[in-house]
Structure formats: C-alpha cells, structure tokens
Amino acid sequence: MARLGLLLLLLLALPPHFSSVSWPDTAQGTMANLILTALEKATLFLEDRLPTINLDGVVGFQVLEVQLRGVQEKWAHKPLLQPLSMRAGQMANTLSALLQKSIFYLKQSDPTYLREFQPSIQPGFWKLPNDWTRTNASLVYPWLEPLDSFSEESSDVCLVQLLGTGTDSSQPCRLSNFCRTLMTKAGCSGYSLSHQLLFFLWARMQGCTEGLFLQSQHYMDIFCANMMELNHRAEAVGYAYPTQDLFMENIMFCGMAGFSDFYKLRWLEAILSWQNPQVGCFGRPDTKGEPSEVPHQQGILRRVRRREKLFADGCSCHNTATAVAALGGFLYILAEYHPDNGDAHPEYYPNHGDPYSSSQSPASNYQDGAAGPDVQRTGRPLSVS
C-alpha cells in the first residue's frame, strides 16, 4: 500500500509534458508494471486451479485476454514500450491456451451452463470500446425497488434468450415481454442492476440492433450512472469485503461499455491491494475483524449473482474474474492514453474534481464498428475524481 500511495503522489506531480522522459521510467510506466505483475500472478492462479475454475471465472479471463491483445497492439510499435508489449502478448498467449483447455473441464463440471453461456467465452465475442464517455449523475435513481422478483434464474433466462442458446433452437437477439420488462425495470440495484447492464452490453456484443436494442445505449447510460453511485457507496464504507466483488464487476462491465470515469486511480490502488500476493487470487481477506456484512446492503449483495466457486483458502472465482477484467481495463485505457500515442497525458483531478459536464450525453462505439449516438467524445479518461 505504501508503494501504491507513493505512485499516486507521483502521478499527481507529473508535469503536463514529459516526452523527454523514458515512458517505462515514469509513474505511468510503474503503474503499468504493477498491473501487469498483478495480472501475471492471477494467471498463475488460473493455471494452478484450472480444473476447478467455473465458467464465471473463465469469462473474466476471456475479457482480460481481449484487453491484453489491445494493449499489445497499441504498444508493439513503440520502441520504449516493446518490453511491456511483449509481457502483455505473452500473457495473452498463455491465457488463450488455458481458456481453450478450460472448456474440457467445464463440459465435465457443468455442461448445461456451458452450453447456455459458451458464446461469452468464445474468441471474438468481447469487443473493446473504441471511444469513451462518462456517466451522467442526473440519471441516478431517486429510489430503489425491492430485489425479490429479480432472481438469478430470471436473469439466466433472459441472457440465454439473448444469446440464442436455449433448447428451443431460437435465434440470438430474441426478447420476450418478460425479459423486456425485467431488463428495463427502473430502480434495481446490486447484482440485479449489473445484470441489466450486462444484458444490453451482450446485446451490443452480439450485434442486436432492432426493436428495444435500438435503445441499448440509453439503458447503458442509466445503468452505469447508477452503478457508479453504488461504487461511490462501496468506497464510502471502506470497500468492506462483501462490496468488493460488485464494485469490481461494475468497473468490468461499465468499463467495457466505454465509461471511462470508472477508471479512477484511487480505485486501481484499492483493487491492487486486495490481491492475495502468494496465491494471486482475489477473495475473502485474511484480516481479522473485517466486517462480514454491510448494513442495509446484505440483500443487494447476495442476490442475482452468478454461480460462485469459493476455495478453502478464501480465493473466489467470481472475485478474481471481476478483478482481472477490471485491472485489464485500467491497463488498456493507460495504453490508449499516454504521450507516445500523440495525446496529451491524462489530466488528474484530485478532490473529486470533474472536468466534464454532467449533462453530456454518453455514448460508446466499439471496434467492430457498431454505431452509437453521434455525440461529443471525451479525450482524457483516467482521473482520480
């Protein structure tokens, strides 16, 4: 933590222009090295426990592989960054082999779940955002609905309909009235909210553009604004253990949806501090006296959560999956916005400053060319706000 705190101070002290400094020797280079090291440890954890990793764990590492490929591509032709590019590429290659091997074990442990959600772990499914925006605080709900009606089973039904992987041999992008109502329901929180976002995010990845999916960006704007609010609440209670998984899931999903303000330096610092340094996983902390529940949030944190796999040493498949995908997003946005790309270095705004208008209409385009609304884009995504 002391090293991370020093890193944050170094980032805040950087001058606006430092192109004469060797990039790997700057604070950004140090930060990239810290992230890569954490991800390498997590990859070793995946390799060590591959026969027992569930599908949710595989999804997180699949997202990470895509992010690492993006980082490798951006750094490959930068002489100063080639060592970092090679590390990212080598890790991506390792993950590719491990993820292919994981399908063998998943067919044995949970064949039905694999059949239903296999598209989410297939190469080419996840696509990186090409443009970035920020959440709009005016879209935060003034109220929260009870979560009893939003079960994991209901979420699965709608996601399977969307993917077209049900037993009825339906086509992708299918939408029943039940799922239309459930996935656009206002006032949801916790995992219900993140799965609403996941539904429209997967619709974008699948190329669903008709009917309700014409409004996918509208709903992602709403959901990520509220997921940002929940992350601020998690931060306010000191990231108590039960909140960490949802906190990282929100960064993973909204980051992939193109919302740059989820990539805050202080949140990166927090996530890096949660890794088990010996095993490489994320999960229940060793610290005695850690609160086991967060008042008024127990129901939110326990509902609509993908199948969990906990190990005896406290490692969690789901926590580790969301952590690596969140960290991969931090690395990707760092690779996209640094001086060698010709951009001014990202501005850092302490004391919760916000350089962007909260009324700005969010939108996001993806590298596959799926179009979003034509609005002004933001250009400096990494901040400490």
Swiss-Prot record:
Lineage, highest ranks first: Eukaryota, Metazoa, Chordata, Craniata, Vertebrata
UniProt-recorded name of the protein: UPF0764 protein C16orf89 homolog
Principal location class: secreted
Molecular functions per Gene Ontology: protein homodimerization activity
Keyword Secreted attached: yes
Changes after translation: Glycosylated.
Signal peptide: 1-20
Region (Disordered): 344-385
Subcellular location: Secreted
Alphabetized PANTHER family for the sequence: UPF0764 PROTEIN C16ORF89
Gene Ontology CC terms: cytosol; extracellular region; membrane
UniProt source species: Mus musculus (Mouse)
Subunit structure: Homodimer.
UniProt record similarity statement: Belongs to the UPF0764 family.
Keyword Glycoprotein: yes
Composition bias type Polar residues, residue spans: 356-367
Alphabetic keyword roster: Glycoprotein, Secreted, Signal
Summary of the tissues where the protein is detected: Predominantly expressed in thyroid tissue.
